[in-house]
Amino acid sequence: MQNKTDKLGFWSIVLLAINSIIGSGIFLTPGSVVAMAGTKAPLVYLIAAIFAAMLALTFAAAAKYVTKSGAAYSYAKAAYGENMGFYMGVVRFFSASVAWGVMGVGVIKSTLSIFGADSTSFKNITWGFVVLMAIILLINFFGQRFLTWVSNLATIGKLLALGLIIVAGVIVFLKTGVNHFHDLDTLKAANGQPLIPKLTTSGLVMAVIAAFYAFTGFESVASGSEDMKDPQKNLPRAIPLAIMVIALVYIGTILVAMAINPAAIVKTKQVVAITAIFQARWLRILIELGALISMFGINVAASFHTPRVLEAMAKEHQAPQWLAKRTRHDFPVYPFMITLALAIFIPMAFQYNMTAIIVLSAMVRFFEFIVIPLGVIRFYRGANVEPVLTAERNWLTDVLLPVLSVAFTIFLLFKFDWVGEFGISTAQGIVPNWFAIIGMAIGFVILPAGLFMMLRHEKS
């Protein structure tokens, strides 16, 4: 039995949420958002933050009705019944497992590049991948208290690194007195055309989606709610607070980058793109180390969330019962090992080609962002299929915000570049991206159908 003192308190939940959300995105990919949106990039991040905050408050509202581990799985099961819960649990577990693998590959490739090794070598990536996962296994094996300590340390490290970018940028700006924010308007490509295209509605939507990916992760925080103190009280307060802190840090980082050297962040080929805005080598090294800490931290967070989805399904008798057993250190070892196997072997089977896996993970999130808000409305109306906790009902968080979240999600899906994501441009035209198509089929159809038949056979 786990002591309550070993469980995550309010501030540890806040730090876990920050650790789950801030990963490699803000360090590696702000250039793509700036390249799409130009001087409107801070506005894009603000819109993405508002959307993330709406969804975070909606998921937090679900957490006050359902405090079982499993997050989206448990919410869907309570709102719609066993079948929807099972489907949500399987696709969420699969995509989260493989997404963890993607994040692991990101850490290894970045580490290899920073230290001058070949980051494209299959052998180098594989060995680095195995070592990283072994370290994370040891961290989890030592129990909840040690994992919490590592997670909190990683969170503080990444916030310090981002804080360093902002402080150093402000100092550079004050020393030079020059604001390069509008230099983007005059940048030219090699063909003489403007480097930043004119912003259209479709372009704005794709930029918001790209920026929004930097905020994803909040939906997984409640996966381990049974390992938290008073989750029904702490989760609805901790998740929105984490989103607010992250939004301020992200927008501050982008504003600093665009004021100092926006051209560098768009044109750079460096692994940690945000370092391109600075000239000082020592400063770049510090930021690169912060990026590695950030990416390692989000891997630790993923190792906490993801296995608990499968464990939660076992506790609800929708997966084999041996998956619900824990070690004497209160570690769900069997779900963890299955998660670890998926995280290692799926990316390896795709030769570390991440395109299909990233698309799969994104599509499952969009699926969640429609199903769960509608489920919260069912909780509010008392239309849930399974019993939920008696919670204080709030029309703003339980009805209005879920409706707005669903509407915005559908709008993003409508404007989503489906051809670009599921097609590959060649000299002969656009051909199907079979990696992406097969990945979607496995995650949404083959795996759920296979596990459903296995479960029915076991029960019979």
What are these model-predicted stretches?
Residues T111, N124-H182, I239-M244, S361-I372, ...:
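Membrane-interface loop-to-helix entry segments
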Residues W322-F331, F369-I437:
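C-terminal membrane-solvent junction of multi-pass transporters and transport-like membrane proteins
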Residues N3-D6, A41-P42, D118-N124, I156-R284:
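Helix-loop-helix junctions that connect adjacent transmembrane segments
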Residues M1-Q2, K77, G104-W127, A161-L164, ...:
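Helix-loop-helix connectors at the membrane interface of multi-pass transporters/channels
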Residues S32-A35, V44, M54-M133, L137-F141, ...:
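Hydrophobic transmembrane alpha-helices that form the core helical bundles
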Residues G31-A37, A41-P42, I114-I125, R145-T155, ...:
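Transmembrane helix-loop boundary segments of multi-pass membrane transporters
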Residues S74-Y75, G81, S113-D118, D185-L195, ...:
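TM-loop-TM module centered on a large, flexible mid-protein loop between adjacent transmembrane helices
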Residues M1-G31, A35-K40, A53, L57, ...:
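Membrane-interface "cap" regions at the ends of multi-pass membrane proteins
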